């Protein structure tokens, strides 16, 4: 006959948490399922309500079939069954069932049953606006709490009420077996929960919209502000951590090791500071000798000197560690920026044309600076704080009693849980603020880069208004971020205050009962304040880490951008011989379904010049870009001296090609350095020789600063003709064997064009040349003219031959000739305007006195 005993064994009290050098089984097996059920039911109910309102049923084809998910189900069911089996065995095997056993069995069944329901809910439904993958915060924290609770059993290692010391009886063996089952199951559930095998590998919103992508930029059209910052946490962390260890730099590696050692020493000092404070107080109250007291005080002051202002943030060790870390931090910053800058230059022209430079630079700036912050917060703030918390729990549990360890444990759990929940909720506001900030900065940069256009249309007020709108939107998002931050800080302060109050009252009570000494109260107060000081910053650390991850998201996206045009593994260099160019049945399209070039075939013999003419959009400039390998062809081949350019290294191909584009963009540097960019190792004499060959040497000398004249942003201080001549001089200095002229004179007046043509003739002499021309008069002497229309070559031949055919070329020639007279006057006026940019200094006559 089963007999129902008292609630606790031996008529004990549940309030007696510490019993016989360990946790009371009655207290432990009541507390753990109560906390788990409360957590899973309260927060799980909120999650269920959220899913009921905002979720949609996932299509079966998107739900992964995983054995690991089945293992999650099995482990949860095992935990439910072990609670029932343990209760049944207790009733059948011992004939006595205590109240706490019934409570433990019932609450555990309900808690794990509810977690099983949440697991099924997250597998079959998805939030409409959710872009994160993986399990929700509720399940992850539930499994973490369950596993942490099983680890609390180790505190009772020396207690005879548990199975650690002796497992001679059957009940002890059964209880130990049930604990092993719970420990293994909760451990695997926690690990599997991080992997989330039952959830899609991609966010559901991405799966159902995979076809709705911007082809040009390869970016998802839908961008959700609610995406979890911790999505891809492992990948991000591994990418960041590789910069903390300076490879091939032994001195910096030693600095990293020393910094880690100092950080460990700080943790030990944090324990001894309160202990010596207790010894001083006990020595003063117990009339210790002066010698002992003086030594104790000296040791205490030395420890405080090493530790610093209560939290190890301004002490000798901390300052020494910070000083040694400077070089490591500089190494990290340099490596990230150089690697990212090189990666950006390796991306295709298509990618750069699809991005705003201001936004890219803003993302790079914030991303690189956030990496150092992230490393500092994780290595020197988060890890030490967690270590201090664990050490504090173990110390107070072993040196005081379990109540103090329990108070700290509960406060830490509540603090971390609420911090994570509220901060995750705030993420969307932070991300929105970053987006608005990018938009505002990009709008300002775009407006300033188009300064002349703004002036042409008297649009200053319009631009200021647009910028004001951007700032207003940014400040709305900023207010949400700061308001939610204030709420988080209040929540954290409340939890810390309640924990400090509970511990202080309990310690004071034991002092009045003569169970503790006054020094013990001082030790507790000193230690707990010392512990809570970094804990008070824990929320800030979490927010800053999250903020750093948010700031790095765009930078990681840049790192993840694949090179559209990249060299094959072990690709050889181009073996240049004479400069023969062959296009064989070339097809190309920027977007799928719309071919720009169709079956293009032609050959340029060494030293010959070929002209590409035709209406806008016919594919002339595309041929230039394909030959320079800004893009790879979709079909056919392009050969230089019989070698397919897609199989050779880009660097070797481009070293033999010189380009003079239609819109020459100069660096904001001196004219000398802009010309020298054609060959950075060139001497000043070689630069001036190239300028003379481009017929701009005398013009440069007429400027006040000569070759040291600044060209301004994008070369805006120079006229169009001057910029083109600088570009020609740059190409002459490069001395390429192949010349590509992409409508190099189309934006110039007739007289300037004639002068430029003379300079171009010098550049192209005895070189293979391809010219894209709008004005047919500039290509009449070409060895061959190709007429393109709608991506196809419709005519080819010399100037006279094409005129005799009376086809497309003849029509274009006739049209341009008939309009040449009417445009001559406007050309002269344009010349006058374009030569006004930089004028040589005029002598200023002196006035007489």
Swiss-Prot record:
Q: List the disulfide bonds.
A: 8-26
Region (Disordered) residue ranges read: 814-849
The UniProt record lists the ABC transporter domain at 581-815
Positions of region (Required for ATPase activity): 1-227
This entry's Enzyme Commission designation comes to 7.6.2.5
**How does the record classify its membrane topology?**
Multi-pass membrane protein
Instruction: Provide a GO CC annotation, any one.
Output: endoplasmic reticulum membrane
Does the keyword Membrane feature in the UniProt annotation?
A: yes
Highest rank taxon of the organism: Eukaryota
Q: Which residues lie on this side of the membrane: Cytoplasmic?
A: 47-72, 120-136, 195-254, 313-373, 423-492, 542-849
Which stretches of this protein does UniProt put in the Lumenal compartment?
Answer: 1-25, 94-98, 158-173, 276-291, 395-401, 514-520
Entry keyword annotation includes RNA-binding: no
Q: Which reaction does it catalyse?
A: heme b(in) + ATP + H2O = heme b(out) + ADP + phosphate + H(+); coproporphyrin III(in) + ATP + H2O = coproporphyrin III(out) + ADP + phosphate + H(+); pheophorbide a(in) + ATP + H2O = pheophorbide a(out) + ADP + phosphate + H(+); coproporphyrinogen III(in) + ATP + H2O = coproporphyrinogen III(out) + ADP + phosphate + H(+)
Check the record and name the CDD domains matching this protein.
Answer: ABC_6TM_ABCB6, ABCC_ATM1_transporter
Comp. bias intervals (Low complexity): 814-825
Q: Which residues are glycosylated?
A: 11
Q: What class of enzyme is it?
A: translocase
- Transmembrane ranges? 26-46, 73-93, 99-119, 137-157, 174-194, 255-275, 292-312, 374-394, 402-422, 493-513, 521-541
Q: Which GO terms describe its biological process?
A: cellular detoxification of cadmium ion; heme metabolic process; heme transmembrane transport; intracellular copper ion homeostasis; melanosome assembly; porphyrin-containing compound metabolic process; tetrapyrrole metabolic process
Q: Where does ATP bind?
A: 590, 614-625
Q: Which family does it belong to?
A: Belongs to the ABC transporter superfamily. ABCB family. Heavy Metal importer (TC 3.A.1.210) subfamily.
Reported function: ATP-dependent transporter that catalyzes the transport of a broad-spectrum of porphyrins from the cytoplasm to the extracellular space through the plasma membrane or into the vesicle lumen. May also function as an ATP-dependent importer of porphyrins from the cytoplasm into the mitochondria, in turn may participate in the de novo heme biosynthesis regulation and in the coordination of heme and iron homeostasis during phenylhydrazine stress. May also play a key role in the early steps of melanogenesis producing PMEL amyloid fibrils.
- Domain-level remarks: Contains two independently folding units, the N-terminal transmembrane domain (residues 1-205) and the ABC-core domain (206-842) are respectively responsible for the lysosomal targeting and the ATPase activity.
Protein known as? ATP-binding cassette sub-family B member 6
Organism, scientific name: Xenopus tropicalis (Western clawed frog)
